[in-house]
Amino acid sequence: MAKIGITETVLRDAHQSLIATRMRTDEFEGILEKMDKIGYHSLECWGGATFDACLRFLDEDPWDRLRLIRKKCPNTKLQMLFRGQNMLGYRHYSDELVDYFVKKSIDNGIDILRIFDALNDVRNLQTAINADKKYGGHVQAAISYTTGPVFDTEYYCHYAKELEDAGADSICIKDMAGLLTPYGTYDLVKALKETVNIPIQLHSHYTSGLASMVHLKGIEAGVDVIDTAMSPLAMGTSHPATESMVAALQGTPYDTGLDLKALSEVRDFFVPLREKYLADGLLNPKMLGVDANTLLYQVPGGMLSNLLGQLKQAGKEDKLEEVLAEVPRVRKDSGYPPLVTPTSQIVGTQSVFNVITGERYKMVTKEFKDMVAGKYGKTPCPIDPEFQKKIVGDEEIITCRPADLIHDKIDDFKADIAEYYEQEEDVLSYAQFGQVAVKFFQKRRDKKYGLDGKHDDMDNKIHAV
């Protein structure tokens, strides 16, 4: 039994889960120095969807955000979420780019990289793990937790051992869908503790209403660190409340040592932000409730709403139950991928197509075809060769590590954005987000030089002032 560490998620996963990652840097900048004095194990503040959201929606440079947080929080370890060979984008990238991104993340202030792969394919993590260790970061390798016939304790213990052998400094059980149950968590953590000799962290969303109980049983089984969120942006599709978990553990052998009065000051800062998000419609009250159907259908809450949205567009809302019944069949056909970005979208969309066309796999998305062909990596279970043939046709099945076939060069991307290039990190923004990054670079340049971008004549390089 030992003191439990707290990773605070309010600056990343909490608002990613509740308000689609729309919290601006200037909205939270004022509380950073107080948060630095709390004594968190770490502050999860970057990566995930924050990078995309900064460029696409907030007109912010994500690298500037990281540098500011580092400056204001010199005493707290900063943590990010990193999708291995996917980096923070939506496809696989070359080893050269992955290595460079990890280097620049650490150079700009990241201490801990939580690295995961949607298929739990350790090959997709190895380059990021190696780079993290090379540049002096802490490697937290994450297990994408899910349910299904193959996902038993033995499966997770085997994968955890693979991660430890690959170089992980700690392991995170990443329950992105809120599918863990309290006693199931206890058994899993006990087994993992007997399998690996590195710390274990627990990450569970409150979607199904079980996350606080999951944390408590995980702690009793030997978990070292838990993910929580300050109460104004906790619960619902977010995480257990930081203050509540700290209070629950006070005076026990697991006492976090954090001061509730100090946490209350942080809470008071975020309360008006929560009210603002509610008033603006950015925070839907439905996101704060419990969706027990998550446990019934075994799909993440976000995926459920996405499926409903697709059916509404097609005028087929009445087909939701059929689609939910189709999801596990599509998962089985495609090798039981865990349902997390991007595989949740791939499986979900294909399930919708199967139902609304009235014939399974009559229409197949490019992404589903690529996944079945092995372009995202090795699925947890082998895919039936006949099914692969049906979906992929004569296209070659990829059995090697997908990134072995990718040879993106940093210099090529740098040449593409020579006109806008201001910092080394711009190459990484562009490599992942293409024209989204270019539009941001244009706005940044216009603001810097007082230009009116609306009236630019790019063909003749004439800018209105």
Please give the residue ranges for each predicted region.
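C-terminal helical cap(s) of enzyme catalytic domains, especially alpha/beta-barrels
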Residues: 234-256
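Glycine-rich phosphate-binding active-site loops on the catalytic face of alpha/beta enzymes
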Residues: 115, 175, 221-238
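Hydrophobic faces of well-ordered beta-strands that scaffold small-molecule active sites
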Residues: 6-13, 41-45, 76-84, 113-114, ...
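Non-catalytic positions within long, well-ordered alpha-helices that form the structural scaffold/packing
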Residues: 36, 106, 164-167, 219
